[in-house]
Amino acid sequence: MSTSSSTSHAADTHDLIRVHGARENNLCDVSVEIPKRRLTVFTGVSGSGKSSLVFATIAAESQRMINETYSTFVQGFMPTLAWPDVDLLDGLTTAIIVDQERMGGDVRSTVGTATDVGALLRILFSRVGQPHVGSAKAFSFNVASISGSGAVTVEKHGRQVKERRDFEIVGGACPRCEGRGAVSDFDLTALFDETKSIVEGALTIPNYSVDGWYGRIFAGSGFFPGDKPINTFTKPQMDALLHKEPTRIKVDGINVTFEGLIPRIQKSFLSKDREAMQPHIRAFVDRAIVFRTCPDCEGTRLSELARSSRIDGVNIAEACAMQISDLAGWIRELDEPSGDGAQRSSTLGAGDGAQRSSTLGAGDGAQRSSAVSGVSPLLASLRETLDSFVEIGLGYLSLDRPSGSLSGGEAQRTKMIRHLGSSLTDVTYVFDEPTIGLHPHDITRMNDLLLRLRDKGNTVLVVEHKPETIVIGDHVVDLGPGAGSDGGQVVYEGTVEGLRASGTRTGRHLDDRASLKVDLRTPTGALEVRGASSHNLRDVDVDIPLGVLTVVTGVAGSGKSSLIHGSVAGRDGVVVVDQGAIKGSRRSNPATYTGLLEPIRKAFAKANGVKPALFSANSAGACPNCNGAGVIYTDLAMMAGVATTCEVCEGRRFDSSVLEYRLGTGDEARDISEVLAMSVAEAEKFFGAGDTRVPAAHRILERLADVGLGYVKLGQPLTTLSGGERQRLKLAVNMGESGGIYVLDEPTTGLHLADVEQLLALLDRLVDGGKSVIVIEHHQAVMAHADRIIDLGPGAGHDGGRVVFEGTPAELVASRATLTGEHLAAYVGG
């Protein structure tokens, strides 16, 4: 039976993702229809509900449904995903989230280990490297070399006999630093007070108090007297305190493992990335431990055996240290006939070329060519992946770069690498502001990559503020009209042309262009930087103007952060406001972080004649059922734990008796839970006048509103804030400090086009108030508003690291001598 070609197949009718009645967070029964296999951009002011719709509803439900296809046992190892609050979700496909979360905090995690490149490179050296030293494990700094022997029972001629067997695993980890690349020296005076005994609290290590479990273990170990000052210990006793191997002991009738202070600290503290530590732990590590490059492996993390094997004169440590754009060229040349030594030597320099010439004889060259031809598919895969790094604007990185040191934007683009060459189609890719950290020159390349994913038959959902990316969308969903409780509605859905004519805030500001600043401030002094050479900086000498707004520009990887964070941030009077995670428990919120809760609690206590502690969910006022958490965490053994709203307090966190106390009179009176449910803008009005006026609280709320956080709720968990929101929260806190120089790292991150003007006004107020403001930024509106610009480049990595321009924005536009100058000129129409 034949079917007419004009008749569409039933399967072709499922070309939409339908969302009906979405109510996550501030969404107000949102209903949208998103076309599949198209690029859809979600826009709107900060806090309008974009992430709630895209991440908390569409992507979350897709991932939850996929997780449910696995067995209960496997689900126990997966994150718990709650049902989104929505009436209907239809037409979902597999969602892959490419977010800005930083990659791995482990000290051994690098760009190479976080992608497939490191593994492919290890296989290449295990197959082609000379001399041959072992399998791919022999080149991994995460695998230690171990050997052993023992007796095994085997059956021979009908009898069981014991035979001695040996085994050996050849790993690539440097035995001295255990693959960390650095060794540590301990300042013992920071570990303990030698004039005190253990029971008197001699140990000054975090969490080692005499009342704590660790303190009890050391006091009752029996390896040294716990009641005598440490400076009276004998040498064996001191060795036991500091270096004792793990030993089972009994303390207070409980079997525990005792281990010396230094190995225990190395395992519990030094195995973590420094930036992932809690502030008090980080302060202790900085105080007690001095890190230096491992003298055995010279920071490469690899054993001498792993470093002895070479391909064309290059060992794996040298390959990983190359800039990725150079490594891609070196891999490409391996496929070429040997004899191109002159060309090949240009990759790493003349000295390396000479080394290769001496390493490879005529016979060795033929042998290498034969070996390389046997791994051609591997080389092709390596080339493709490394070329993707270059295409995505990350060619300036190296594979040995710690992954924890990548910015949120760099981490997001690194995660994109694995998807660019994927053979999957009909997948939904979800991106959270992919242009973060990108120079205008690099945004075009990012747009091309998004379009490539779409053209392979995938659905691409992008949350974005940059007009350069909004305009490439096939479909636009604009949320608003405001933020928080004033948002959560779809104010426009359709094409980019329709958005321009829609009259929404996004539509009105889509084609905004800032003009060059006319009234420039005169610097009052200069901050001298001499011989800056960290990372890719080339002995940079620069005078950073004081008393003005200085914007530091340049393509990604040009050396901006290295210059400012490496040479300015550590000086006296400098306040650095970055986008790093804010450490705290899941109970932490803007009210606790900013100190706002303290004057609020005192105001409640004074108005009701009770103690302030009653108005803390972490203290006397906590709900007795959930202990002030607002939710009950249930451990389901092999299945994932479940968090359910507390039935007693209904998520309000406080005891019912506390909620009877109110602040204010009449209809305006509020209890403490209602205050914490307010947005910053609502609380600013509440505490700004009348019976509820609290000046100390109002000052903090004014600063929060000034930095564009008026939509954030006072009791909102800090873990729900984006990188840009975290930075603005830190800025609000630091605005109350006495520092004279403020350093801001891309403060426009997460800001809507309409909010950038508010940020510029805030920066002006800081400078007019006597502060010096240094901003690392890519946004052309901020560049145009600067008093002075310092542009680094001309390229990224070893192609950058130089100051290519110093002067006013008008001078930069007039010269157009740099990439930044060209794009700023195009932006202002110069």
Predicted feature residues:
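Conserved phosphate-binding elements of NTP-dependent enzyme cores
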Residues: 1-830
